[in-house]
Amino acid sequence: MKILVMILTASVVVRIEAVAQPIHPIPFASTGNTIELTIANTSSIPLSAVKVEAKNAPAWIRFVSSEHLLQQVEAKGEAQALFNFSVDKSSPVNQKHTLVFSISSPSGDHWTKEISISILPPTTFHLDQNYPNPFNPTTTISYELPAASHIVLKIYNVLGQEVATLVNTDRPAGYHQEIWSAVNQASGFYIYELLSTDASGNRFVARKAILLVK
């Protein structure tokens, strides 16, 4: 899903005024997002080799290219730098994050612009298949929460007997991972069950099979 996050105008000869910036919502675990930066040359001479660069982005934001070189910005003209990016599901949600862009020219002029974003929570509850599967002796169970919830994650054998409680606690909205160590368990199939209850009392239950091979 392609999203235009914002259009930013930065003057290369006029001081950038400090103004309040909106917080731009970005869909959870999304791809094809775009930040478009418009560089305006308000001088009477062309500017060449203007570098625009995303600086110190968090690891969960992946830019296709974090740097663009504008060969020339005409006098009284504009040029655009497009930054395409994806958001990893490990990103924290419902929090403000600041992306910093650096604009520099060969003459030594330098400007920065900050853009505020917030990653939206998942739209639905989801329980992933464990990985690896089959496994020995540990495996990872991942799930997504659209809202802060109380989580109970249990493991059962094929007879329906509980063999482990991995989680019984509150978790915020977003993506989470839990580890099951089955060192003391016998080979065979097991069932893991996720029970989630949010503040409004909405409940979600999901179960998946898991295979331990020793």
State each model region's role.
Residues 116-121, 183, 187-214:
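C-terminal tail/sorting-segment detector
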Residues 42-60, 100-103:
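Short acidic, flexible loop segments centered on an aromatic residue
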Residues 156-163, 190:
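Short, glycine-anchored, charge-dense loop/turn motifs used at functional sites
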Residues 63-90:
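Intrinsically disordered, low-complexity Pro/Gly/Ser/Thr-rich segments with frequent PxxP/GP/PP motifs
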Residues 44-50, 135-139, 163:
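Short acidic/proline- and small/hydrophobic-mixed sequence motifs that coincide with surface turns
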Residues 87-119:
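Terminal connector regions
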Residues 116-131, 135-155, 177-180, 199-201:
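Glycine-centered coil/turn sites that cap beta-strands in beta-rich domains
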